[in-house]
C-alpha cells in the first residue's frame, strides 16, 4: 500500500515538475546589446554622410573611388568589429545574418564605385537599400530590448 502511495506521490511531483517547466519561457534569441545598437547607429551616420558627399560630387572629379578609399576602409573596420561582437553573443544568428548581408552590400557598393562615379539615381537607391538593412538590424535589437516577439 505504501509503495502505491509513494508511486502516486512521485507521479504527482513529476506532473507538477512538467507543468512548471511548460510554463517557463524558452529564449531562442539573444538579449539586447547596447554596443551593437550604438555601433550600427554610428555606421548609419557614416553611410549617410558618404552618400550625401558622393551625391554632391556627381559629375565632378572628386566623385571617383580613389577619393573615397578612406571611407571604405573605415566602414569595413566598423562592420568587422560589429561582426565579431555579434558572433560572440550566444543565440544571435538573426543579427549575425543581417550583419553578414550588410558586409556583402558594402563590398558590392565598393565594387560598383570602382567601376566609376555613382549617379544621383544610384546614390538614392543605394542609400535607401543601406537604410533598410540598417533599420532591420536596429529593429531587431530594439525588439530584443523590449522583449517583444519578432513576428
Q: What would you call each of these model-derived segments?
A:
Residues 1-13:
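Bacterial N-terminal signal peptides that target proteins for export
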Residues 62-73, 95-100, 121-128:
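Short, charged, amphipathic alpha-helical segments
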Residues 19-23:
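C-terminal motif of bacterial Sec signal peptides marking the signal peptidase cleavage site
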Residues 25-28:
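Bacterial signal peptide processing site
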Residues 86-113:
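Heptad-repeat alpha-helical coiled-coil/4-helix-bundle sensor or tether segments in soluble regions
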Residues 31-55:
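Post-signal peptide N-terminal segment of mature Sec-exported envelope proteins
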Residues 52-91:
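Alpha-helical segments in soluble extracytoplasmic regions
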